[in-house]
Amino acid sequence: LFSILLNEPLGIQTIPTEAETMSKEERFEELEQLAWQEALYDPGTLDWKEKWFLDGSRSTVANTEKGMILSAGPLEQDHACHTVLWTKNSFEGDVKIEADFWRLDTATRNVNIIYIQATGREEGPYTKDIAEWSHLREIPYMATYFNNMKLLHISYAAYGNQDDAREYVRARRYPTRPDLKFNELDIPPDNFETGLFEPGIKHRFTIIKKGHELLFKVETEEKMSVFAWNTSAFDLITEGRIGLRHMWTRTSRYADIRISVL
């Protein structure tokens, strides 16, 4: 019988997943071999408006021969300068997300985030279909998302809000609740100083969410890392849109974006 593990920060029990009975790398390879079916493909070179919509009036999206450049607005501390690029499609069940990524900024603070299967919390104006309340996100204030959306979040090429902050990869599960503050949404473990995400270097991302398993593989020509989290302290995320979030001043290029389901 599996033992029950205690998630100390939340006081919530988690149930061990298959990823915790083998190495992260072995489990990732096992999951990657499943019968995934492509549900979206975007090379990044075509008109982004065909498959995406944008939160943030001060951000830009540019399609180039090398991929799609997503740029947040230029002013730090101006919440209108955040951005989120959302898929028009919603994806149900288990999901695999792949993309080539190049960091184009040299920032040492603020974060990039991928939002996985986002829906509204279904209270007040925050209906299940997040496209229905896009007007409430013309200024993409972070709290609007973590208070009012159900989703999984992975931070990458991420830093704190101080220049000497350490680079990290972190997972979270939204939304907050009266008994659960934003800093309690973390899914352990955090991963600091990964040695990844140098500006101008091509990274291949592959994210797999299967049941309560969440894995993130990052590859460059010189390095490969797999990050893994057990999300079972929270209710299962089962459907929703995929979003790319850049905080103010952050800029990156994405290409060969593929989303698959089982």
Segments from the language model and where they lie:
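Bacterial Sec-dependent signal peptides at the C-terminal "C-region" and cleavage site
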Residues: 4-21
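Extracellular glycan-recognition regions
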Residues: 16, 20-262
